[in-house]
UniProtKB/Swiss-Prot annotation:
It comes from Shouchella clausii (strain KSM-K16) (Alkalihalobacillus clausii). GO terms for biological process: translation. HAMAP family: Ribosomal_uL29. It comes from the Bacteria. The keyword Transmembrane does not apply. Pfam families: Ribosomal_L29 (PF00831). GO terms for cellular component: cytosolic large ribosomal subunit. This is Large ribosomal subunit protein uL29. The lineage of its organism: Bacteria, Bacillati, Bacillota, Bacilli, Bacillales. Gene3D superfamilies: 1.10.287.310.
Length: 67
């Protein structure tokens, strides 16, 4: 998910999205440990999506208006 898409969401929606991404990351890491992961690149994508969401939340806290 792109940062511009995240900026259109409400803070609660972003927090919910972050939580679901964290759960997905947990499941992906579990699959990696058990050798069942088909696409290891997905772990990186999910981590970056979490970082983007946290960045948008932090921008809102600081009052930065990017985008």
């Amino acid at each position: 998910m792109k940062a511009t898409d995240l900026r259109d969401l409400t803070t609660a929606e972003i927090e919910q999205k972050t939580q679901s991404l964290k759960e997905e990351l947990f499941n992906l890491r579990f699959q990696l440990a058990t050798g069942q992961l088909d696409n290891p690149v997905r772990i990186r994508e999910v981590r970056k999506s979490i970082a983007r969401a946290k960045t948008v939340l932090r921008e809102r806290e600081l009052g930065i208006n990017n985008g």
